[in-house]
Amino acid sequence: IHAAYVRLDARWEQLSFVGGLRYERTKTDGEAFRFDVDTNRGVLQNVDRSYGELLPSLHFRYELTPDSILRWSYSTGLSRPHYPDTVPRLVISDEDREAEAGNPDLKATYSHNLDVSWERYLRPLGLISVAAFHKRLQDPIFIGTSTIGSGVESLRITRPENGDSGEITGLELAWQQTFDQLPAPFDGLGVYANYTWADSEADLPFGIGKTELPGTSRHNVNFAVFYEKHGLNTRLAYNSRSAFIQEFDAADRGLDVYWDRRELLDFTASYQFTSQWTAFAEINNLTDTKQRRYQGVRNRVLELEQFGRAWQLGLRFEY
């Protein structure tokens, strides 16, 4: 990847501006064996691709008051496909009559992004913010499953494909506050809360309809309580996200694959007892949450994962 950019900064009293233009040139080379059904042999196939994109951006910041800021921005972005997904590969499982394939024609996803936000800084140390965003996507990437053949000779192939376009519209609310005004020892307490609502829609490949964007939950919640004082730092954090689509089925949308709603509770703590030594502890997934993947409807379970709690204790030395 080669890139070059220009940037302009300007300020007029309470209004400041940052603008830029970035050019990125991407080149990929790869090779893999492709199975040839006519010769019943593997054939070495080379894939060479290159493309360039212009990525403009505009960012405005206006100080309504010393403690209140309004922001507006337009930007563009490029999300490249995972390199293994672009390799011309085909891995077949004879037992399940299923296969995974790469897609050498997979395109990068280009996005146009609009964001507007209002921030209010709280005393002694805190923040309230409200933000809205809208993104338009070109060539979003999906993981799709299709079936070739019929009966016992059929084969279900899963591979990445590009859709035509998509969009996401959302709202984000955030609040962070430390309570320095409380009497000791409670003056080290603080909270952080964040909620994001996102509505997404995209055209599926092959013109078979529309769906939500893969990996995009409609609801995301984060909440944390923390304590920071005299070298002691502790944090109890809760995260929740609603169900989201992972894969679509080209023949039967009732077989689309989803990850179910998930909730996690994590705890971290550290204590710096000298300028160089810090003891720390981390416990992830305190509630031993299970993760469920289902097909079409929630009671058609494909996979149930339970990894348990993860513990980590240690000492950190800095010099």
Listing of model-derived features with the role each one plays in the protein:
Residues I1-D67, V91:
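Signature of Gram-negative outer-membrane beta-barrel scaffolds
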Residues I1-H2, R49, L78-S129, F133-L137, ...:
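Outer-membrane beta-barrel signature, preferentially recognizing the C-terminal barrel domain
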Residues A4-A10, L58-Y62, V116-R120, L173-Q177, ...:
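Residues on the lipid-exposed face of transmembrane beta-strands in outer-membrane beta-barrel proteins
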Residues E13-Q14, T65-D67, P124-L125, D180-L189, ...:
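Short loop/turn motifs that connect adjacent beta-strands in outer-membrane beta-barrel proteins
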Residues L15-L21, P56, L70-W72, I128-V130, ...:
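Transmembrane beta-strands of outer-membrane beta-barrel proteins
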Residues D29-V37, Y83-R89, D96-E98, P140-T147, ...:
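Outer-membrane beta-barrel translocator domains and adjoining extracellular loop/strand segments
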Residues F133-R136, S154-F248, T287:
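Gram-negative outer-membrane beta-barrel transporters
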Residues S240-D249, S270-Y319:
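C-terminal beta-signal and adjacent terminal beta-strands/loops
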